[in-house]
Amino acid sequence: AEGLVPTGLSVDGIDYRKSAGNPLPTITDPRTLYLNARQGMASSDFSGVTILLPKEAGLTELAEQINGAWQKDCSLFFSVEEVPQEEFDKRLAADSYTIALAPIRAEGGSVYQMLQQFTAEGGGLTGWSAPIYSQRLAESAQQTGSARCALLADCERQLLEGCAVVPLLGQNRRLLLADGITGLVFDPFTPVLDLTDA
């Protein structure tokens, strides 16, 4: 992912990703940062850590890849817990998780609504809150054009720098089907449409 907000979204006719630039924090050596942070911690401090996923969201393979990388680079392995979407939403809302892989949506293509999910008014997706974040987001609703893009970009950077979220991948391809169509298999990452059983 190039940022939390995927490519292809615009704000007042301006390409948001192009205007906002790269919001990802610069971490020159993530492994050294991790090793420094882990000093004084025992491996047992990480026991019981699980990666929470919504069932049937297509995130199982991604969780396995992440777990493999953590095991290889950091000698850590976490169990994966897949739960129905309703339970997943409840646990996110109750802050009852250690690590969660949560799809973040830009409903209607709105950067503002996407970022609002991280405020109390927008549902508090991660339980993270920062008054300056909410203030800047509210200010962005009063602005237009490049001024609005700049405020939204500040919000996106704040989320990423505060490690409230870490974007793993972005998807802006989808397939819409008419009612009654069954048996199609769509892989948005390739993209491939399999009509074998249709």
Predicted regions and their residues:
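Hydrophobic, well-ordered secondary-structure elements that form the walls
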Residues: I51, W70, L92, T98, ...
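Extracytoplasmic/secreted proteins, especially bacterial periplasmic and envelope-associated proteins
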Residues: D29-N36, G58-Q65, A69, E87, ...
